[in-house]
């Protein structure tokens, strides 16, 4: 089921918009809730295909993508990251996963040049991590 509704609107409309893609409803709801409490706007997707559609439709508005690596469908989180980097190289993509070993983590980071947040994580860890990514400089040298 696609969730194209942006949550956390209203008085927070000036806050960064984050896309979260995960096929586990409980994890998706947890991340969405934590980010909303931290005053971020959130769009969720339960498949990579949905996430890709949202990225295309909201290009220039989304400031960060959090995606699980292992997801059902014809493409996975790594494929999504590659597509996003071709469409918008300045848009940061963070992998969230609990499925990989430490060696696989390092390989994913080195090959894909992506950041990785390991599940499980505490709410404050997620908030701090997201805040740090939103304040990183983009490849053009401008802070996002």
Can you say where each PLM-predicted feature lies in the sequence?
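Non-catalytic signal-transmission and effector/linker regions of two-component phosphorelay proteins
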Residues: 1-19, 25, 32, 61, ...
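The feature encodes the CheY-like receiver
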Residues: 28, 72-74
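Charged docking surfaces used in two-component/phosphorelay signaling
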Residues: 29-37
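Acidic catalytic/metal-coordinating carboxylates
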Residues: 46-50, 75-80
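Two-component signal transduction core modules
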Residues: 65, 116-117
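Hydrophobic/aromatic residues positioned on beta-strands within the core alpha/beta folds
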Residues: 96-97
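Acidic, metal-coordinating helix/loop segments flanking the phosphotransfer/catalytic sites
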Residues: 44-64
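Active-site residues of response regulator receiver
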Residues: 68-69
